[in-house]
Amino acid sequence: MIWLLALQLAVGPAQHYEKAKQDFAQRKFPEAVSEVNAALHESPDMVPALVLKARLATFAHRPDVAKSCLITAITADPTSEEAQFFLGVFYYNQNDFKLATSPLQTAQTLSPKSPLPVFYLAMTHEAMGDATQALDLYQQAENLSPEKSPQSASILVAYGRFLFSLGRYKDSIEKDRRAIEGDAESRDAHYEMAKGLDHEGDFKNAAPEGERALTLPELGTSDAQIHFLLANIYLKLKQPDLAKAHLEKFKAASQTTRR
């Protein structure tokens, strides 16, 4: 009977964790919190559960809890690529770029074929003003994510946006084009493409890209940003009625955001 009790105790936290993962994937956050807490009550050093609790805490705007869970996870298992990666992401999102670098580099070493640690390192070096290193890392991230997918599209959008900031407009547009091929539902990709085409004077093709962006879910790029861009594009296309309509929508969206 002792071995049966031991087996039940061992399986218990794993079952709670698996249920928490399912709830998290289905965006049932209160249920996921309950399950992950149950897993950690039975197994306080369960690294995957600590990482999941940290991610849930981030959604709940509890950075103190997220940081504590991730540091506990790394203390329990310094070789956890997932824990190192999410600690780096945590610091990146807190704009603490110097602290983000070390765990992201560790995650990259632990999982050299994963594009995500390299991608976040690229954005971190970009934020710190190290353009040369950022360019190299963005290219590495792109090379590690060759398949057309929403993940590769996100990498290409960020890469293209960085190239745009460096004045490499044609290269930027090419990244945006490939991002759209990878994820036609990416609002950010269509917006960045519209912005690039507008800069290059291709207003006729920029307008439909901006209009397409407006039809997609608002995750990163806001409605206000797109309306402002389209207002300027339609002015250049000598379509004042459309320009005026988008300008009014830009003002309305901006007021809504400020409330």
Give the role of each language-model region:
Residues G12-A14, V47-P48, E81-E82, F97, ...:
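Helix-start (N-cap) detector for alpha-helical repeat units in TPR-like alpha-solenoids
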Residues I2-V11:
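Hydrophobic alpha-helical targeting segments used for export or membrane insertion
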Residues E42, A76, L110, L144-K148, ...:
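Structural marker of alpha-solenoid helical repeat scaffolds
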